[in-house]
Amino acid sequence: MAEKYILALDQGTTSSRAIIFNQAGETVCMVNQEFPQLYPEPGWVEHDPVDIIESQISVAKKAIEIASINPDQIAAIGVTNQRETTIVWDKNTSKPVYNAIVWQCRRTASMCDQFKKLGYEDTIRKKTGLVLDAYFSATKLKWILDNVEGARQKAERGELLFGTVDSWLIWNLTGGKIHATDYSNASRTMLFNIHSLNWDEELLELFNIPEQMLPDVLPSSTVYGYTHKEIFGVEIPICGNAGDQQAALFGQICCEPGMVKNTYGTGCFILMNTGNKIVDSKHGLLTTIGWVLNDKSMCYALEGSVFSAGATVQWLRDGLKIVEKASDTEYLAKSVKDSAGVYFVPAFVGLGAPYWDMYARGTIIGITRGCTREHIVRAALESIAYQTRDVVEVMSEESGIKLHCLRVDGGASANDFLMQFQADILGVPVERPTVSETTALGAAYLAGLAVGYWKDHSEIKKQWRLDRRFEPQMDPETREELYKKWKNAVTRSLGWVEK
């Protein structure tokens, strides 16, 4: 009998990817295709939903072809996606009524301010675990219904459907048969009650959203449906589904309460598994659903985001032009023994958790005549580690769980200097796995578990392989002195822009 594989569809903000995994959890083949970003007005970000589905199907077919396997050798498909991005389409024609409004889009910021003035911030946080912000789906969906001609009337007649990107993919892959999402994606809409695990009637009324347009909410690991035969020539079960950061948490096998992963991308996404316990954050962390397995076992998570990580390195390269490529930062940082007292607070667009100061701005402080580009580069990399500690400290305090180890992935996790400094400033080991595609791997694991491709958690747990473990080498006194100065530098950047 021919060997079977799992196909993960990883639909991101700038590209669609398809990755095929074997039973050992190893990458057999990966295909990536970028698609256009649309900026119709300042602060607005959109995608064409047709680009999303076409690019995703294209890379899936190419991956099967490059791997030299037959479509019937795919045991299951797992889906993972950019979260919060909002799509509304016609139930009968499957045509979108408007472009996808992307998670980064700020067009509904003033709408959020109005709801804050009306005093709904606390209600929304208690029900959804989220802060009232344009980042999430609710106000994006309301904007489409309020601004696209005829949309609200059609929605009230039951003719329109809403979904995050996973729902749009599943709808199209199943030929319009399945309109569903999973608990992790639902928890990012600002319409889902994370306590009752249902769409919240009070919030639907508040945002004026007809309930009939919302998808069914299913476990992250269960059979959703089957691909339409015309796509791959055979029907393949779609069995795994989770938002990208939750999928990465699962792919890192952070399955025990207290386990934490950090994805170092443009920003950082730090998630802590809190088990079946909902931790109500008082310091601006998000409480979110990690995943729900088919046996209804539940994982909640705390999430903190750092706005500028890889973006800081990009600025060194493209703005200051003091490095030619991002990878140069490692040897430049290592070429000096410390940052010579220089601190870099990369508040280009304000600061995220736990400060939540949109009026903060970037600062490089502690400069003397002896300061060189190497010191500035080193301070920039160190800032990523300091910001991660800021989030992790709040997570530990609010969850009551002490961090014992940090698992890492994403582009900047390849930087050995940064990973060593991260271990030093946290005072705990940092573990980097051999498989860097942890988001796709998480979706693959969720799909494979649903069809028995992998037996259970313990089987996939054994597959997590260490590339390198960075042990802390800094003495506690130095660590705390450096961190104290970082906090001092941050206070200088807060509230810089006058309101």
UniProtKB/Swiss-Prot annotation:
UniProt catalytic activity: glycerol + ATP = sn-glycerol 3-phosphate + ADP + H(+)
Entry EC number(s): 2.7.1.30
UniProt-annotated binding residues for sn-glycerol 3-phosphate: T13, R83, E84, Y135, D244
Pathway: Polyol metabolism; glycerol degradation via glycerol kinase pathway; sn-glycerol 3-phosphate from glycerol: step 1/1
Spans traversing the lipid bilayer: none
General function of this protein: Key enzyme in the regulation of glycerol uptake and metabolism. Catalyzes the phosphorylation of glycerol to yield sn-glycerol 3-phosphate.
Family: Belongs to the FGGY kinase family.
UniProt-recorded name of the protein: Glycerol kinase
Originating organism: Pseudothermotoga lettingae (strain ATCC BAA-301 / DSM 14385 / NBRC 107922 / TMO) (Thermotoga lettingae)
